[in-house]
């Protein structure tokens, strides 16, 4: 074989090796499998509510973020187009996305509950802003601006003695007698920083400060745990205090578990990162004290008492605490949770595994957040922008 031919073959081999390595870096099989299972061809996410045929704004918003992390613009376009057309009546500036869509009582299909869920609203706005930035798509930014302005008009309230705060939705969270209800898991610090960067006069940093105060309140959170819901009662025109939500209880469970994940994913340089991790330290104690070393499914924040359930911990709960324990320097606990998630996903997604063995939506969704972060597919910067691994290593989908 001639020297030139040898050199050509070597060069071809190098190109093939680089191409293979890049494919491994740029592909995200976990997202691709998730999309195959839960996302219809038209961009509608199934199984993200109590009924498998219904869709939630939460499911749509999370899938948009996963598509962004996976550099999957085609799916992102479909997800947002379907959401805007079907959940917002094609007018995101006037209509916040109804949180539940499906078959209505009259057998027609459409929005079942027009009340919005602010966590989904914010995830959509965030995904749109970052998609506009990394894919150079101005229309996404225009849509994000309309959505954020709508949120600011309808969901940001000024609370006596606290400041600006985010309501969970337009209806049902402001009550007579000066009572407000909040959901700690609806507020992701990275998003609030990103919105402040985009709209510096809208009060998003004040919302971030109020959320941190809620988590740090020792009267309503004496054991360093996140509750699903928290109440706030005005005591005068200028004062108030956090209380147990009178419409639920002091339980921390399926909503609250996300609060730990968002805290763990916060950029270390953010001035609220360390205080938030400290405010939630009770999860470390509760997890370490369990027989399995896994987070409790249900825990009462006022007493620290764990509800007995034969030691069951959903896979998604372990997934949600990997970044949290890692950020707190509790690497043994983080590794224990990561091992559980890795093992569960490997078994569920094996080619020989039946479809019924795959994780349910909520566990799978939390695992995508956790595994993507652990694999460094994304990181939140101090200004709230997201750093995506594919930006440097992969072809951008324009």
UniProtKB/Swiss-Prot annotation:
It is an enzyme of class 3 (hydrolase). The active site is at 58 (proton donor), 119 (nucleophile). Transmembrane segments: none annotated. Pathway: Glycan metabolism; bacterial cellulose biosynthesis. InterPro entries: 6-hairpin_glycosidase_sf (IPR008928), 6hp_glycosidase-like_sf (IPR012341), Glyco_hydro_8 (IPR002037), Glyco_hydro_8_CS (IPR019834). Residues 1-23 form the signal peptide. It is found in: Secreted. Its EC number is 3.2.1.4. It catalyses: Endohydrolysis of (1->4)-beta-D-glucosidic linkages in cellulose, lichenin and cereal beta-D-glucans. It holds the Pfam family Glyco_hydro_8. GO terms for biological process: cellulose catabolic process. One of its GO terms (molecular function) is cellulase activity. One of its GO terms (cellular component) is extracellular region. Its main location: secreted. Keywords: Carbohydrate metabolism, Cellulose degradation, Glycosidase, Hydrolase, Polysaccharide degradation, Secreted, Signal. Belongs to the glycosyl hydrolase 8 (cellulase D) family. Hydrolyzes carboxymethylcellulose. This is Endoglucanase. It comes from Pseudomonas fluorescens (strain SBW25). The lineage of its organism: Bacteria, Pseudomonadati, Pseudomonadota, Gammaproteobacteria, Pseudomonadales. The gene is bcsZ.
């Amino acid at each position: 074989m001639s020297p030139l031919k040898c050199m050509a073959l070597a060069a071809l081999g190098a190109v093939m090796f680089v191409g293979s390595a890049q494919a491994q870096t740029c592909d995200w099989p976990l997202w691709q499998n998730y999309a195959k299972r839960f996302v219809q061809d038209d961009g509608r996410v199934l199984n993200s509510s109590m009924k498998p045929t219904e869709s939630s704004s939460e499911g749509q918003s999370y899938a948009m973020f996963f598509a962004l992390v996976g550099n999957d613009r085609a799916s992102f376009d479909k997800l947002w187009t379907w959401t805007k057309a079907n959940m917002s009546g094609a007018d995101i500036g006037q209509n916040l996305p109804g949180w539940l869509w499906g078959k209505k009582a009259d057998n027609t299909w459409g929005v079942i509950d027009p009340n919005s869920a602010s966590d989904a609203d914010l995830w959509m706005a965030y995904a749109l802003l970052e998609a506009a930035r990394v894919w150079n798509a101005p229309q996404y930014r225009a849509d994000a601006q309309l959505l954020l302005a709508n949120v600011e008009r309808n969901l940001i309230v000024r609370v006596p003695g606290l400041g600006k705060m985010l309501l969970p939705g337009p209806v049902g969270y402001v009550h007579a007698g000066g009572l407000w209800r909040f959901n700690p898991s609806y507020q992701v610090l990275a998003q609030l920083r990103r919105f402040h960067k985009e709209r510096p006069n809208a009060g998003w940093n004040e919302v971030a400060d109020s959320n941190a105060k809620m988590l740090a309140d020792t009267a309503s959170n004496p054991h360093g745990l996140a509750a699903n819901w928290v109440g706030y009662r005005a005591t005068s025109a200028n004062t108030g205090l956090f209380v147990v939500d009178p419409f639920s209880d002091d339980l921390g469970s399926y909503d609250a578990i996300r609060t730990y994940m968002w805290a763990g994913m916060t950029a270390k340089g953010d001035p609220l990162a360390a205080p938030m991790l400290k405010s939630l330290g009770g999860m470390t104690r509760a997890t370490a004290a369990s027989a399995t070393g896994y987070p409790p499914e249900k825990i009462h924040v006022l007493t620290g008492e764990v509800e007995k359930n034969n030691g069951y911990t959903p896979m998604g709960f372990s997934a949600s605490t990997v970044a949290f324990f890692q950020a707190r320097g509790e690497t043994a606990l983080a590794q224990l949770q990561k091992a559980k998630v890795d093992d569960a996903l490997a078994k569920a997604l094996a080619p020989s595994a039946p479809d019924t063995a795959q994780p349910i939506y909520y566990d799978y969704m939390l695992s995508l957040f956790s595994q993507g972060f652990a694999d460094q597919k994304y990181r939140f910067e101090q200004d709230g922008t997201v750093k995506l691994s594919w930006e440097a290593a992969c072809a951008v989908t324009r």
